[in-house]
């Protein structure tokens, strides 16, 4: 592994640099090392075995390989160094003597510490020994990185610089910094020496160059070739290719530097970035960036070439490559201006002549400057330059050349600047023109649309659509068509030309008028810029009838064919654009603004408003004379006839009208107590009498009215059923109140009247009246003292019909409700007495009754609403304050403890749907049990024969 004849990485004698190497390196004649150093000599007569890293040596008669590829004729060291018959050091340093031991780092007894042989402290080797990394040579020794020297007595520097004399640290020949006094020594940064040497590459592929890559006819770090190959930036070199595409013919380094073939005596060195410097004579030493000097001169850091004779005869160059002679020496500047070479620029531009390309593809032939001159080639964005030596400024200003500017300007004679300002001569000659970034064409336009000249020119397109010699519009509708002058518009519609026929319409309808009118066209806001059309006037969006209308109806001028359009607010402007005019315009064309503003020839022309938009607004003549309100006289007859009632109906209803019910038998305070008649009657009053009594609003105006006694007397003709022929019978009084002072005659008459009433009670008419008039006793006469006569028998008869009614002071209503005490009794009580009414009973003859067991307060309760309104009965049910929103609290009003008795509360048989009256029926017992379990009511009694159910409740009003 560390000294066998077979390589480690499996290469069959060709590991890394041959046609069958592991990493695909290919060569035609000679194998390559890892770093592309080709070690081929005229004296190699044996098969060269290759190491693992591609380095080989051509020691005669021996093909043994080490780990790092050193081919030695003798035993191999640990790192592949070749040793004759000597012992190896730990790092394989080989000594040239047969009995000497290797030192620590592989240096021989007369060598340096890093593997260089005897000559120099920095590894200059004069014997045929190998460096630690396996670079081998028959007569010369390699340095630390394997650079070798072709001289039999030559030495190698640390980075592979080779010269005929002693090499410095960085490969310079002569002193450490390469400055020769009378000779042609190289400086520290790669100025080459004039001595001829073989074409072996250093670490970066430089052949006999300094540390920074000055090379003679071989590839640099980025593959710059001296003849025709291409480097990383497209320069074509004739030799092999690097990893960036440059392919040398011979062996290449890691980055594609080509090491020249045998027999080449011209040292052509390349720079760091692949600049190639070729020369026909002598050794051309290159600088850091590949500048070439013709003679044996010293170059600066950036490869500047100085051909004049300086002190001690040296040709010294300046810092940026400016040559100090007037000879034909070709040297490249800082940005890659190169002479006498053929290559492509960074982006692939190709040059016609033998000039190299700069950073942006500028191709310079002979005398390039830093920023200006350039040769024919392709620019950054693809512009073609086909003329001879032309120099272009930073923004594309180029005098009389075909080179385009940075932003795409291309012209044969007159280039364009950044904003399109053209550097034109004073004469009005025709020329081809290029376009700037914003489309301003040269020869005519200023940066903002000014028109300097009226020369004829070609056409070009801009970014915003400005195109001369065409009929297309730009983004904002500016048309730049012209037959004589390019009609280019500014960014905001400024027309910076002298064209006579521009017919396109802008985005908002701004249209430059011309001699030829379009048929139709209206702006977005109704801007119509044509004064005449073939179809008719164009209406704006707001209904304006004028031709050229702005946003608010302002119209442009219609005076000439100069094409004036309306602005946003109707201002008319007949002046030119904001650009400075150097030449008077041919035709006075007005300019178009962004929103269609129009120029007006004079300020005396009054603005025209839109009739449709402001037709409804009355504009006063002045502020001091406002429009006054119109007044009209009112006729006296109209004033007299007008009244407050004219706003109402001709026959309005009265607010409070009495009830028109004639069927009511008993009325109190204009209020009928009959619920059926009250429900069916029609009242003209706005307010309901019932609601008025519920709210007690009537008592507000007449508080003593309630205590007045009202007597309603009606003549009942049906009572005269008994015809008496004598005068005595005619004098009989129906109802009298007997007193102790009454005479016997009065007692006799009273007994007769009682007997007659008994007969009348059994008559059919009396029975008929029982159904209708039992609740309204009809007094027919008065006593001498004026008291009312009440038939007591009637009360007894009615009381006998109502079960459980003990008192005779009862008032019955036609809806079968009754109340006790009667309404008359309750009405005669004072306010204090109404606050405590005992034994109040409200009932229905068919459904049941309610007996209040505690005194009730009827002061705030309307009496006629107790029966049927506040207390309602139904089959097997009784409810109090059911339909009222305002309910009394517990213990107030009638919300006190009471006993409720319901009639006919029989359970219903589900099969027959009939009440169960059998006292032994099981459902009856079950129904009684449910009644007892009711938690709200307290069960008292149930009569199964009559079906009377009685219970008590503490607070009957359910809140």
UniProtKB/Swiss-Prot annotation:
Bias class Polar residues marks the residues at 12-36, 137-153, 192-245, 294-303, 353-377, 679-697, 777-790
A cellular component term, taken from the record's GO annotations: nuclear pore cytoplasmic filaments
Q: Name one GO biological process term.
A: post-transcriptional tethering of RNA polymerase II gene DNA at nuclear periphery
- Provide the positions where the record notes the PTM Phosphoserine: 763, 783
Q: Where is this region: Disordered?
A: 1-104, 121-172, 190-394, 672-697, 745-794
Domain Peptidase S59 stretches? 814-956
> Could you state a single Gene Ontology molecular function term?
RNA binding
Family the UniProt entry places it in: Belongs to the nucleoporin GLFG family.
In the record's own words, the domains note is:
Contains FG repeats. FG repeats are interaction sites for karyopherins (importins, exportins) and form probably an affinity gradient, guiding the transport proteins unidirectionally with their cargo through the NPC. FG repeat regions are highly flexible and lack ordered secondary structure. The overall conservation of FG repeats regarding exact sequence, spacing, and repeat unit length is limited.
Q: What is this protein called?
A: Nucleoporin NUP100/NSP100
């Amino acid at each position: 592994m560390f000294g066998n004849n077979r390589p480690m990485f499996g290469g069959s004698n060709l590991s890394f640099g041959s046609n069958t190497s592991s990493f695909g390196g290919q060569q035609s004649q000679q194998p390559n090392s890892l770093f592309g150093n080709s070690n081929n000599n005229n004296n190699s007569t044996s098969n060269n075995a290759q190491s693992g890293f591609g380095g080989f040596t051509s020691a005669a008669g021996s093909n043994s390989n080490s780990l790092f590829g050193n081919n030695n004729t003798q035993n191999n060291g640990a790192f592949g160094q070749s040793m004759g018959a000597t012992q190896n050091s730990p790092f394989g340093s080989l000594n040239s003597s047969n009995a000497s031991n290797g030192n620590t780092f592989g240096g021989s007894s007369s060598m340096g510490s890093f593997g260089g042989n005897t000559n120099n402290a920095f590894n200059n080797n004069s014997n045929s020994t190998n460096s630690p990394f396996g670079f081998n040579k028959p007569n010369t020794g390699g340095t630390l990185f394997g650079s070798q020297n072709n001289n039999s007595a030559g030495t190698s520097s640390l980075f592979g610089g080779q010269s005929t004399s002693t090499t410095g640290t960085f490969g310079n020949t002569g002193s450490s910094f390469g400055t020769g006094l009378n000779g042609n020594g190289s400086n520290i940064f790669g100025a080459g020496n004039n001595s001829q040497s073989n074409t072996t590459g250093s670490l970066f592929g430089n052949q006999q160059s300094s540390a920074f890559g000055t090379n003679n006819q071989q590839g640099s770090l980025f593959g710059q070739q001296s003849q025709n190959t291409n480097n990383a930036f497209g320069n074509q070199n004739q030799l092999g290719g690097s990893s960036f595409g440059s392919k040398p013919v011979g062996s290449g380094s890691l980055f594609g530097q080509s090491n020249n073939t045998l027999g080449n005596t011209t040292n052509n060195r390349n720079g760091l970035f692949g600049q190639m410097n070729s020369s026909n004579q002598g050794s051309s030493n290159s600088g850091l960036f590949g500048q070439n000097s013709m003679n044996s001169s010293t170059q600066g850091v950036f490869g500047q070439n100085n051909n004049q004779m300086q002190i001690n005869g040296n040709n010294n160059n300046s810092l940026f490559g400016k040559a100090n002679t007037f000879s034909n020496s070709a040297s490249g500047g800082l940005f890659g201006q190169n002479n006498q070479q053929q290559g492509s620029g960074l982006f692939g531009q190709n040059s016609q002549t033998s000039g190299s390309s700069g950073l942006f593809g500028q191709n310079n032939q002979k005398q390039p400057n830093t920023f200006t001159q350039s040769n024919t080639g392709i620019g950054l964005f693809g512009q073609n330059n086909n003329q001879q030596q032309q120099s272009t400024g930073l923004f594309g200003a180029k005098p009389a050349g075909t080179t385009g500017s940075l932003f795409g300007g291309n012209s044969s004679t007159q280039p364009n600047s950044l904003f399109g300002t053209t550097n034109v001569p004073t004469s009005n000659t025709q020329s081809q023109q290029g376009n700037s970034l914003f489309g301003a064409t040269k020869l005519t336009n200023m940066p903002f649309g000014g028109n300097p000249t009226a020369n004829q020119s070609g056409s070009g397109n801009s970014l915003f659509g400005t195109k001369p010699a065409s009929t297309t519009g730009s983004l904002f509708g500016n048309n730049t068509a012209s037959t004589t002058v390019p009609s280019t518009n500014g960014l905001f519609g400024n027309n910076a030309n002298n064209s006579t026929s521009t017919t396109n319409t802008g985005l908002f309808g701004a249209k430059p008028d011309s001699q030829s009118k379009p048929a139709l066209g209206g702006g977005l806001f109704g801007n119509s810029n044509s004064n005449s059309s073939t179809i008719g006037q164009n209406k704006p969006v707001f209904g304006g009838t004028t031709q050229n209308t702005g946003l608010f109806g302002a119209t442009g001028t219609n005076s000439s064919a100069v094409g004036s359009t309306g602005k946003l607010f109707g201002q008319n402007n007949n002046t030119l654009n904001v650009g400075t005019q150097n030449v008077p315009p041919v035709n006075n064309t007005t300019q178009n603004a962004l929103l269609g503003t129009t120029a007006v020839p004079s300020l005396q022309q009054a603005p025209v408003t839109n009739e449709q938009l402001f037709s409804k607004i009355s504009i006063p003549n002045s502020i001091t004379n406002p429009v006054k309100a119109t007044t009209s006289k009112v006729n006296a007859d109209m004033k007299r006839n007008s009244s407050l009632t004219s706003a109402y109906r001709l026959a309005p209803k009265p607010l409070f009208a009495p009830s028109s019910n004639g069927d009511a038998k008993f009325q109190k305070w204009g209020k009928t107590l009959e619920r059926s008649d009250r429900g069916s009657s029609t009242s003209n009053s706005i307010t309901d009498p019932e609601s008025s009594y519920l709210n007690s609003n009537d008592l507000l105006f007449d508080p003593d009215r309630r205590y007045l006694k009202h007597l309603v007397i009606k003549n009942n003709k049906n009572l005269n059923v008994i015809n008496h022929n004598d005068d005595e019978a005619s004098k009989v009084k129906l109802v009298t109140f007997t007193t102790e002072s009454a005479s016997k005659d009065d007692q006799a008459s009273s007994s007769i009247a009682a007997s007659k009433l008994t007969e009348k009670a059994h008559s059919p008419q009396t029975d008929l009246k029982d159904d209708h008039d039992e609740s309204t006793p009809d007094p027919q006469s008065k006593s001498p003292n004026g008291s009312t006569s009440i038939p007591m028998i009637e009360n007894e008869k009615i009381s006998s019909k109502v079960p459980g009614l003990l008192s005779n002071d009862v008032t019955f209503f036609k809806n079968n409700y009754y109340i006790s005490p009667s309404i008359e009794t309750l009405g005669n009580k004072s306010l204090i007495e109404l606050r405590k009414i005992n034994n109040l009973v409200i009932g229905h003859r068919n459904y049941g009754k309610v007996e209040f067991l505690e005194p009730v307060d009827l002061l705030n309760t309307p009496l006629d609403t107790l029966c049927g309104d506040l207390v309602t009965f139904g089959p097997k049910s009784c409810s109090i304050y059911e339909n009222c929103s305002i309910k009394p609290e517990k213990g107030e009003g009638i919300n006190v403890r009471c006993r409720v008795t319901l009639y006919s509360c029989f359970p219903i048989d589900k099969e027959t749907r009939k009440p169960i009256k059998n006292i032994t029926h099981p459902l009856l017992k079950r129904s009684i049990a449910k009644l007892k379990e009711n938690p709200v009511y307290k069960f008292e009694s149930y009569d199964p024969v009559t079906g009377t159910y009685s219970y008590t409740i503490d607070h009957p009003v359910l809140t």
